[in-house]
Each structure stands twice: as structure tokens, then as C-alpha cells.
């Protein structure tokens, strides 16, 4: 089911692997057997806070609003330091902006947009504490586990488009014009439009890339996924996922 101007909510029961399409504001959600995220939405009891991990607990020591050399950007591990603060505010759902790698070619600004996904199957190295012995997956899992200890559910954002970098390495994922050039959606010059296909014929390559993202989120133990601008993809795409 597509949510007008927003997205879709998909609940995935890990035991049966059955897909249930359900309405919810702004996203697509995967829930395990003990996950109550769907009921929170349906009962209007979800107190949601959106965070960009890259800046959420960044250490801007000199206060110039730039993470200079020697200053730590926000990451999975230092974000844990602020979870008690989030809990004390009565927040029970964290909407985490995209954690996928950020494209650098044609990037907007110096850091690039987190919605310009360089791929859909790995974790943004900017969000990883280089001083930790834990892997990127382990660090992400630790953050989510610490959220769960505080009764905070975690929704991870799924970008709607791919970065220009991804177009260069995987052109089969994208729509092309008559000159075989990529298509820029609206004025988002750092991303290119994915070729998801139609309700009658989906693009299996794009579908497989998104399924890899779903598998990553399930591996991390997150409670849900918000699908950004979900209505630009055919409804059959979300049903298939």
C-alpha cells in the first residue's frame, strides 16, 4: 500500500517471513516477532525523533559548526552517549537518516547528502569509530541494542535514488534517456533516478539491490525502514520486497 506523498509500511515477521502491507506515516517498516512498532503507529503512540548520526553527537570542539581535522564526527558509538537524553524526552522511536555510504562525485556541499547512496548494501564509513576494535556491523548493532535497552525502537531510512558514483559503477540500475545519459530527478543534482521498472515488469537488478538493504537492516536488528519518496516506485515493487 502506498501512502500519499510519503511511503509504504511493510511488516516482516521473521518466523514466517510473511509480508504484510500496512499504513504508517512516512515509511516502510520491518518488524520481528516481538516488535510492537506497527501497533505504536496504529495506536498513534509513536513519539518519533529523527537524527542524522553524522552530526547527532559530533564533537565540534571549537564551535565553528564544521568537523575539522582532529574533531570526531557523529558515529554509532558516540551516539549512545545521548540515548538517555532521548529516553528522558519520552521518545520511543528513533528515525535514523540513511546509513549507506555517501557519494562524493557531484556531492552537494563538502560532506555530501546522506540521501545520495553510493550503494545500498554497506554502511557509511563516516559513521564508524575508527578507534574501536568493533566492525562497522558490530558498532551499528551495539547502537541499536542500546536503543532497545531503553525501549527505543529504530527505523532506518532508505534513500529513494542512487548517487552519481553508483550510476558509474552500476549503470544497469538506472533510467537512461535516448542518449544513454542518466536522469536527474527534480533538482537533486547529486543523485540519479533508479529504474525500478513497472508494476507489470520490475527491474530485478534494482529489486535485488534493495533486498540487500533489507537484509542488512535485519542483520543489524533494527525495527523498521522508512522508504524515502516511496511513491516514485511502483506498488508492485514494495509488495515484492
What does each model-identified segment do?
Residues 34-47, 52-92, 98-220, 241:
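Substrate-binding/active-site clefts of carbohydrate-active enzymes
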Residues 1-10:
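Short, Lys/Arg-enriched N-terminal segments with co-localized hydrophobic residues
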Residues 29-31:
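Boundary at the C-terminal end of the N-terminal hydrophobic targeting segment
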Residues 155, 224-230:
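Short catalytic-loop micro-motif centered on adjacent basic/acidic residues
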Residues 97-98, 228:
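Active-site beta-strand/loop signature of hydrolases that rely on acidic residues for catalysis
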Residues 166, 230-238:
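Acidic-and-aromatic substrate-binding clefts and catalytic sites of carbohydrate-active enzymes
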Amino acid at each position: 500500500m502506498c501512502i500519499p506523498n510519503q511511503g509504504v509500511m511493510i511488516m516482516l515477521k521473521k518466523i514466517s517471513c510473511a509480508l504484510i502491507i500496512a499504513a504508517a506515516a512516512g515509511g516502510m517498516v520491518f518488524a520481528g516477532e516481538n516488535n510492537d512498532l506497527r501497533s505504536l503507529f496504529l495506536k498513534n503512540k509513536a513519539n518519533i525523533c529523527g537524527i542524522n548520526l553524522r552530526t547527532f553527537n559530533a564533537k565540534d570542539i571549537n564551535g565553528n559548526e564544521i568537523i575539522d581535522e582532529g574533531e570526531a564526527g557523529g558515529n554509532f558509538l558516540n551516539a549512545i552517549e545521548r540515548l538517555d537524553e532521548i529516553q528522558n524526552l519520552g521518545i520511543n522511536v528513533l528515525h535514523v537518516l540513511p546509513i549507506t555510504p555517501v557519494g562524493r562525485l557531484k556531492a552537494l556541499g563538502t560532506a555530501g547528502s546522506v540521501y545520495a547512496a553510493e550503494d545500498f548494501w554497506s554502511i557509511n564509513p563516516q559513521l564508524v569509530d575508527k578507534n574501536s576494535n568493533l566492525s562497522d556491523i558490530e558498532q551499528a548493532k551495539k547502537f541499536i541494542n542500546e536503543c532497545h535497552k531503553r525501549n527505543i525502537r529504530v527505523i532506518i531510512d532508505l534513500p529513494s535514488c542512487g548517487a552519481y558514483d553508483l550510476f558509474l559503477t552500476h549503470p544497469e540500475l538506472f533510467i537512461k534517456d535516448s542518449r544513454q545519459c542518466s536522469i536527474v530527478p527534480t533538482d537533486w543534482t547529486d543523485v540519479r533516478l533508479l529504474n525500478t521498472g513497472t508494476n507489470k515488469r520490475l527491474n530485478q537488478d534494482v529489486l535485488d539491490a534493495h533486498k540487500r538493504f533489507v537484509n542488512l537492516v535485519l542483520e543489524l536488528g533494527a525495527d523498521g525502514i522508512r522508504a524515502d519518496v516511496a511513491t516514485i516506485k511502483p506498488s508492485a515493487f514494495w509488495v515484492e520486497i
